[in-house]
Structure formats: C-alpha cells, structure tokens
Amino acid sequence: IDATVNLTLRILPDNLLLAGIFIAACFISLSIGTSVGTIVALTPVAVGLAEKTEIALPFMVAVVVGGSFFGDNLSFISDTTIASTKTQECVMRDKFRINSMIVVPAAIIVLGIYIFQGLSITAPTQIQTIEWIKVIPYIIVLGTAVAGMNVMLVLIIGILTSGIIGIATGSFG
C-alpha cells in the first residue's frame, strides 16, 4: 500500500489528490461494474493518503465511496443495471442515458468541490522511494478487473501476487 500511496503522491499535485481519487473511483467502478469491489481496491490507498496528508480519514473514504457509487450506477456490467433493465424491460443504453443526465451534473459539481477543497492540502515534501515491485499487485487487480475477469478470481490473483511479492521482498514479519 505504501508504494502505491508514494506513487500517487509523486504523480498527483497536492491540490488534486481528492479529485484524483474521486475520478479513479468513478472510472474503476464504471469499468468493473461493482462499487464494493472499487471500495475494497481503493480504500487502502485512500487511507494511506489520508495518513500522509492532513485530509480527514472519513472524508477521504467518503470520496472513494461516492466515486464508486457513481460508476456502479452507470456501469453496463453492474448487477443492479442488468437486473433493473431486465425486470423493467428497457434497453441498457436508455438507462445509461437517463442516469447520465442525473449523475453526471452531480459528479461535476462534486468534482469542483473536491478541487476547491484540495487547494488547502499539502503533501509531505519528502516522499519515500517508490518500491515499484509492490505496485504490481494493484496494477494486476485493476487490470484484470477492468478486463472483465470474475471478481473472485481477481481477488485470488491479487492475494497470491501480493503474498509472493511480500515473501520475496521480506515484507512479512
């Protein structure tokens, strides 16, 4: 987690941390069709960012949850989208269009608020070295999830990859 947090702190300007996490949650959830899966994947990184900045932990987690719900609401592969379109006998494209008119304006307003809130954020000036090998499990989990792989298989692969890398780098114990 620390490697991914350090990578995020290096890539994103301080004032865009909140907006960046929100956009990432929106995109991931929209791509994989599950808000819960997105929350599970991003919350550890968000917690790490909150610990290294002055961002309140509950607020940072709320940013992840809000973005996750946005994407899940619009995703074509979300279980609720599939169930609702089948039971209501409507076309997914129509549901997407109508939901977009509702949630996209709200997301734009929220994004503006996060950008404004981010103006007061300062990250530590000394960012630890990024251990690139420890970022690999996140890339694999996000990549396989976005590719549409079964959620349980994605989680198993993520756990195994993390375990192997953790043992290889001596990160356990």
Model region roles, listed by residue range:
Residues 66-69, 73-128, 133:
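Juxtamembrane and boundary regions of transmembrane helices in multi-pass small-molecule transporters
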Residues 1-50, 173:
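Membrane-embedded alpha-helical segments and adjacent helix-loop junctions characteristic
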Residues 15-27, 54-71:
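Alpha-helical transmembrane segments of multi-pass membrane proteins
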Residues 23-35, 66-72, 143-149:
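Transmembrane alpha-helix interface/packing and boundary motifs in multi-pass membrane proteins
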Residues 34, 38, 84, 115-123, ...:
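Transmembrane helix-loop junctions in multipass membrane proteins, especially transporters and channels
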Residues 23, 27, 104, 108-112, ...:
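Generic alpha-helical transmembrane segments of integral inner-membrane proteins
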Residues 22-26, 44-45, 64-69, 99-104, ...:
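Transmembrane helix-bundle signature of multi-pass membrane transporters/permeases
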